[in-house]
Structure formats: C-alpha cells, structure tokens
Amino acid sequence: MQDKQKIDKFIDIRARLSKNAITAMERLEETGYEAYIVGGSLRDILMDRSVHDFDITSSAKPEKVMEVFSDFKVIPTGLKHGTVTVLVEDEPVEITTFRSESGYSDGRHPDRVSFAKSVEDDLGRRDFTMNAMACRINGELVDLFGGQKDIANKLIRTVGDAKERFSEDGLRILRAIRFAAVLGFEVETGTRDAIHQLGHMIEKVSEERIVSEFNKIMLSENPSTYLREYKDIICIFIPELEACIGFDQKNHHHVHDVFEHTLRVVDNTPAKLSLRLAALFHDISKPICFEIGSDGEGHFYGHASKSAEMAENILKRLKYDNATITDVCQLVKYHDHQIENSDKIIKRMLRRLGEEDFFNLLDLKRADNYGQSEEFRYRQDILQELERSARRILEENACFSLKDMAIKGSDLIKLGMAQGPEIGEVLEMLLDKVISGEIKNDRQELIACLKDTGAIE
C-alpha cells in the first residue's frame, strides 16, 4: 500500500533544495505535471548530508519537458532513457521521466526501458530502499519500501527480491558494500546472503566501475569491516588476496595471519587512496615468499619488492591511472626499508621518494607497526623522531633535489659543458656531494668542485 506522509524531519523540503531545483519543480507542477526529488539526493536530505546534485523525476515525457522549459537552454542528454538536462541560471538540473526497466541479458543494463505511468512504478525499479523514495515540493513523501525505516535502522536493503536485483545488475553488489562502508550501515541479512551467493555477477562489471566503487570502500572510515565481511567478493577481482586469508606467519613479530594483519594496517592509515591501496598490497606476496629459517621462524625475504611487482600487475589489470600505480608501488617497495635517523639518509629518501611520499611512507610504517605484536610498539617513537628530523630539514630549506641546487643545467652549458646527458650526470654527482655534506649548496663552491673533478676547465 502506498505510504504518503509529510516529512516530519523536514517540514519545509524547500530549505534543502537549491533555488534552481525549486524553479524546475515549480515550473513542472504549474504546467500540470508531477515532479519529485528522488534517489540519492532525497536520501542525503533525509540523512542531513550535503547535497550537490538534485535528481528530479516527473510525469512529463522528454519532449514535454523540453516544451515546458523552451525559454531555457535544454540539453537532450539521454532522450532514449527519458533524461533531459535543463540549465537554470547555468546550473544543470537533470529531469527524468518516470520509467520502468526489464530484461538484463548482460547482467548490467536493461534490455528495455519504457516510460511508466506513476512515480510508484518508477521507484520499484530502483536498487535499495533508501534510494527508492520520492518527495514533492510540498513535502509529500512517497516511501513504498520502508526507506525511511531502513535509514533509521542503518540498513542497506534491496527493493524487492535481492537475488533478482543483483542478477539484473552485478554492480549493485559493490554498491551495496560501498553504501554500507561509506554510511557506516549494515547490509540486511537477506541482501547480504544474496551478495555472497551472486558474487560472480561482478565478473560482468567493467574494471572502471569496479574501481570507482572499490576506491570509496577503501576510503571509508573502517574499510576492514567490509573487506573482512565481503572478502569473497573482493577476491573475485583481486584473487591474489585469497592466499593471504588465514596464512599463519609463524613469526614472533606477528600475532595475526597475513590478511588480518593487512586489514589492521589499512584501518590505521590516513584516508588517502594511494596509501590505503599500498596498505592493502604491502604484504600480498608473503605466502609466495614464505620460508622457515634456521631459527624456526617464518621469514619473507624480498617480499617488499615482490609485493610491489604484484601490486603493479593488479592495479594495471584494474586500469588504475599511472600516477596512482607509481605511488602505490613505491610505497609498497619501501615499506620494510629501514631508514636511519641521519640528515644524510633522510635527504636521500626525500630525494628518492619526494616529500609527499616520504611522509606517506612513514604513515604506512606506523600502520604496519600497529598491525604487529605489541612488544614492537616502541618503533612508533623511532618513526616520530624520523618525522621530526625530516620536517626540520624541510624547514631549513636543505637541498635534497635538483630543483634546490644553486646551479642548473643552463649554468653548466654557459660554463663550457656540451649539451647532452653528461649534464644530468654531473648535476646528480653534485647533488650527491651536497647531500652527503662534502660540499655546500653554494654556486661558487659547486663551480670549484666541477673544476676539481675536471668537468669544466
């Protein structure tokens, strides 16, 4: 039975709508059509979350929408699916006709999209109850599937039969996990069971869409909760993780298996994508590199480099951008590298990693330590001292990269060096001497060094 009621929490829905969304809805209603705020924008309004884009659904067919807004710039963004974008004072307002969908032969997209007679029919095609509500400009709410109740109980629940919803579109499986992770919700029991039963539907989803959802899970407040609960789903597109689950490290540094240790590291890193991904992959090669040493303990010689190699293959397969791949692999490669607290060593690491990744590496090392046995927690103090030293070096404007040098390649050419790769090699040699403290980053002293080494006359 249809449940229409005033929104108690928001007596005046207008207070949460943009002026241009109000203009669009009023124009539609004044010309005899129904207009509703719907989907994620209404969900976020009900949850007191910020809303940037307002989705409007209407009884008006696309051509009628274009007539109603004939004095506005109208973009027929998706006429086939009933979507028209109206520019109201340069703000794009998307208006979609009530519609129904049927047939999902590819497990992702509907074979047929047709216009529906009512908003109730439109809401029935949506994925989750919290996204299947609609509200008119006067505050009249249509909530047929208990979306408000599920929001109050912090539950992700499909509209109707969960198996049907996930069989229609495999992406909904990841969306359910992502919504739970980002909102801090639980997935309702029947919906959760269907996710585990139909995980294979993810194989029909493009890498780009998988990555878009997975990144949001990784950047949520407590990703480990959802990576643990849905590890079978994650392993469908990152099968390399499967060997880590339950893998006993047999080492006194560790009280957790590789996967549980990894989850703790992920949770303890700041919410930066490259850092969280590096945390996920930092020990992924441990099952491959494992061996029992003469001391009777498990060892993982070379696992940092091997994990970086595996991370690169995984990220390329999932079509991550090159910058992210480079950052993640660099952090994984050096996560187990011991950094001595000396200006010379720290400058060399700053030179090798760059300022941002150097501090990201320290964050990864801290998180890695928190995932180990408590008896080694004293290393947090060592890492804190390293950070203090690095920040002091930066505050002193110490030279640790070519851009900081008091002499440039153009200067070497003016001093008589021939243009070519030798210029770069000479600059690197000078930088190395400056970092090691052999010479100062002073133009005259650098030129004197060039003469002493025979680089110039």
Residue ranges and their predicted role:
Residues 1-457:
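Catalytic cores of the polymerase beta-like nucleotidyltransferase superfamily
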